[in-house]
């Protein structure tokens, strides 16, 4: 009798262990379901190979190959991929916490029947598209996922990431080191008045014709040392861009002759177009047609001599 009781207890224990073991796959399945944007390859969204977003005004498309991320519309564009990677990381984090709105909301009531914003991401072999509808009073946006029935709410901070244009992701050029040690001549030319100023360095300092202008040149040297482009305005522009930006008849042209690191004299030219209402000039660098924006205070020291 005692042996029978022990056998029964052992059987109960085995059944209990089987029940516990049987629950683990169910929990794992639930966890997988909670990853709303999961894919069959179980890759992280940060491993995506394609990203596209549209906010009804701008469309940005990017693809990744062995050399990194590229802008699909012009793969020669000097793209800083940091913003793309940040967006994918934000999408990955958002996906882990998405839950459908309860009670359910009709697509028409959430602005999803005619969504004006979308984001598409490709991870492995799978492509997922998110569509964004109306924004609620609390700032959140309704979102739907193509191929799924649920409606979700996402933070405004994430949706705002689709408001950034590709030009704001450009790697901006930098000027070579230009100091009193390697500068030899600075030439300023005003397009409007056809006026030219040539500043030449001698052993006694900087001169404009026969008048010493060392102090004025020091201000220009400081401006050159701190000079940075504010943003990219137009990359690989059409021929119409130059007259539209006032670069066909520039406000001023600044040319600096200097001795480079290998001991050869070379030149650098900044061409200033129209002054915009926001206080920035359209600017090009050397023979590159890319148009940049530069605030007027960065070139004030040069224009003061014209």
Language-model-derived ranges and their functions:
Residues 16-19:
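C-terminal motif of bacterial Sec signal peptides marking the signal peptidase cleavage site
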Residues 8-14:
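Core hydrophobic alpha-helical membrane-spanning segments
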Residues 5-8, 21-306:
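A short-motif feature that recognizes glycine-rich, charge-decorated loops
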């Amino acid at each position: 009798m005692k042996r029978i009781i022990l056998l029964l207890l052992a059987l109960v224990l085995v059944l209990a262990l089987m029940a516990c073991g049987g629950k683990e796959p169910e929990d794992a399945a639930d966890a997988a379901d909670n990853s709303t944007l999961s894919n069959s390859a179980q890759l992280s969204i940060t491993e995506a190979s394609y990203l596209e977003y549209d906010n009804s005004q701008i469309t940005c498309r990017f693809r990744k190959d062995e050399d990194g991320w590229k802008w699909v519309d012009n793969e020669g564009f000097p793209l800083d991929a940091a913003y793309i990677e940040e967006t994918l990381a934000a999408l990955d984090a958002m996906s882990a916490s998405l839950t459908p709105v309860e009670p359910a909301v009709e697509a028409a009531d959430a602005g999803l029947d005619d969504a004006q914003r979308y984001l598409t991401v490709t991870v492995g072999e799978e492509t997922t598209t998110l569509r964004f509808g109306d924004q609620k009073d609390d700032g959140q946006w309704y979102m739907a996922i193509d191929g799924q029935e649920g409606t979700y709410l996402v933070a405004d901070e994430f949706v705002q990431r689709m408001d950034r244009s590709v030009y704001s992701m450009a790697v901006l050029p930098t000027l070579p080191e230009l100091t009193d040690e390697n500068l030899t001549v600075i030439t300023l030319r005003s397009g409007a008045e056809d006026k030219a100023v040539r500043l030449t360095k001698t052993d006694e300092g900087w001169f404009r014709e026969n008048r010493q202008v060392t102090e004025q040149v020091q201000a220009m040297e400081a401006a050159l040392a701190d000079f940075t482009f504010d943003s990219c305005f137009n990359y690989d522009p059409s021929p119409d861009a130059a007259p539209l930006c006032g670069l066909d008849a520039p406000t001023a042209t600044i040319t600096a002759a200097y001795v480079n690191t290998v001991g050869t004299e070379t030149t650098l030219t900044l061409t200033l177009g129209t002054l915009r209402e926001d206080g920035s000039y359209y600017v090009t660098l050397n023979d590159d047609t890319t148009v940049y924006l530069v605030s007027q205070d960065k070139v004030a020291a040069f224009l003061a001599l014209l």
